[in-house]
Amino acid sequence: MPTINQLIRKPRARLTVKSKSPAMQNSPQRRGVCTRVYTTTPKKPNSALRKVAKVRLTNGFEVISYIGGEGHNLQEHSVVLIRGGRVKDLPGVRYHIVRGSLDLQGVKDRKQARSKYGAKRAKKAA
């Protein structure tokens, strides 16, 4: 245990917290251009074809981000908005693409949790 004098000379080091989404640079969202849109498989024990896109951001970072929801209209050179948030079963995917913003359309025929997928409210059938 250090003496008070030792602590005055050299205070205790503060623990630095490492960012889980460094490419965001403390922004809530970032804009970028898709450089590659493809599917990848999750790690064990899950099995699927997850839709992901490699995105070059306006700040120069190139990140892999997840495209949530059923179906999408993304292709190379699409402009997208990304937010933080990893996908647990896809290593290296630390960002999500925001649905219904810029070039990415919302999920069609979505009834529940619509705001998460950029879906407008359905018209009431009279």
Swiss-Prot record:
GO molecular function (one): tRNA binding
Keyword Ribonucleoprotein: yes
Annotated Pfam families: Ribosom_S12_S23
Modification 3-methylthioaspartic acid occurs at: 89
Keywords attached to this entry: Methylation, Ribonucleoprotein, Ribosomal protein, RNA-binding, rRNA-binding, tRNA-binding
GO cellular component: small ribosomal subunit
CDD domains assigned: Ribosomal_S12
Gene Ontology biological-process annotations: translation
Function (record text): With S4 and S5 plays an important role in translational accuracy. Interacts with and stabilizes bases of the 16S rRNA that are involved in tRNA selection in the A site and with the mRNA backbone. Located at the interface of the 30S and 50S subunits, it traverses the body of the 30S subunit contacting proteins on the other side and probably holding the rRNA structure together. The combined cluster of proteins S8, S12 and S17 appears to hold together the shoulder and platform of the 30S subunit.
Subunit relationships: Part of the 30S ribosomal subunit. Contacts proteins S8 and S17. May interact with IF1 in the 30S initiation complex.
Family: Belongs to the universal ribosomal protein uS12 family.
The protein's name: Small ribosomal subunit protein uS12
Native organism taxonomy: Bacteria, Pseudomonadati, Pseudomonadota, Betaproteobacteria, Burkholderiales
